[in-house]
Amino acid sequence: MSDLKKAAQQAISLMDLTTLNDDDTDQKVIDLCHKAKTPAGDTAAICIYPRFIPIARKTLNEIDGDDIKIATVTNFPHGNDDIAIAVLETRAAVAYGADEVDVVFPYRALMAGNETVGFELVKACKEACGEDAILKVIIESGVLADPALIRKASELSIDAGADFIKTSTGKVAVNATLEAAEIMMTVISEKNPKVGFKPAGGVKDAEAAAEFLGVAARLLGDDWATPATFRFGASSLLTNLLHTLELGDAPQGAQGY
């Protein structure tokens, strides 16, 4: 198997197969659950809006997809600085049955010089997850832009108890970049290599996936990237990976996240 095919195979096992669109329906989520059981093995998770968690759980149970985690989003997509609302949304997501919660860090507050609210919001949402769900923190690196801010958001999130740090919501102009990945995984290597990393949005093909995995290997070791420490947030990526593995049709034009 070529290196590119190996990267494609690995990326599928690390994927949070995502639909976070305003026009999502029960049927779209059911279809997503079926897609997550790919000819190359299951994706790590699906990522959906909280209201679809019950139908996703029912569907995964029906198709022997119990190993596929259900991730959802809170404080999404704007990363507001109201801690109480973020906590209520996170508690509700866990009550719905989410295995994983991707919460948006209040990145605009950080850009305005407020480091405290981000730390406190992540800490409170981590407490809301309890032992029932892991917490991924979306720092919106493409809007932060400044390497010092990307580093600070990563440090604050990890210090507050994040299980993963994630680049992007997929709802802004600049999503996952190798530059942000380098900064974020450097912070992980310095602070706690058990914390995971999730590039999201903009990872479109096996070549791009391989580049992100390469950064992980260089900074954290060849065996570091597993579903416990690395995820790709993506929707259109899966089609390309299956095509690379000669298990699916060629991708049809540009598709979102």
From Swiss-Prot:
Keyword terms of this UniProt record: Cytoplasm, Lyase, Schiff base
Catalytic class of the enzyme: lyase
GO cellular component: cytoplasm
CDD domains on file: DeoC
Subcellular location: Cytoplasm
GO MF terms held by the record: deoxyribose-phosphate aldolase activity
Entry annotated with the keyword Cytoplasm: yes
List of catalytic residues: 102, 166, 198
Descriptive protein name: Deoxyribose-phosphate aldolase
Organism of provenance: Shewanella pealeana (strain ATCC 700345 / ANG-SQ1)
